[in-house]
Amino acid sequence: SFQAGLSWECVLNKRKDFEKAYDNFDINKICSYDTTKIKELLSNKKIIRNKLKINASVNNSKIFKKIQSEYGSFGEYLKTFTNGKIIYEIEKTTSKLSDDISKDLKRRGMKFVGSTIIYSYLQAIGVIYSHEKDCFMYLENNKCTNI
């Protein structure tokens, strides 16, 4: 969610500092952040100090945990949108899938989870496979459903 309105490079360059500031991204710890911890994050010059995004990160972690509890895992939640299939798409930044997931997460109360951010997340975890067939990263035996 920190990427909203910023370049990916800006966020990725701060990844190690975010990881340290956010307790190695331990979801259980992030869920319990209080006003003292939020003030600490807001004063940390090594991360993005946007109050709305910091508050959203704590809020979103709580909703993420609820989804895990409801579905058994966040992966199982995502499978309700994909039927467990890997999707091959190139030259896109959003799709109906990312639109639908974004809308559902927003309905549940998450913030800064627009379709472009969700699409990038789905690419990062391998749900959307975006390597062109002549790319050195393209896998001959991939499990994409629409190549």
Which stretches of residues belong to each language-model region?
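HhH-family (HhH-GPD) DNA N-glycosylase catalytic core used in base-excision repair
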Residues: S1-I147
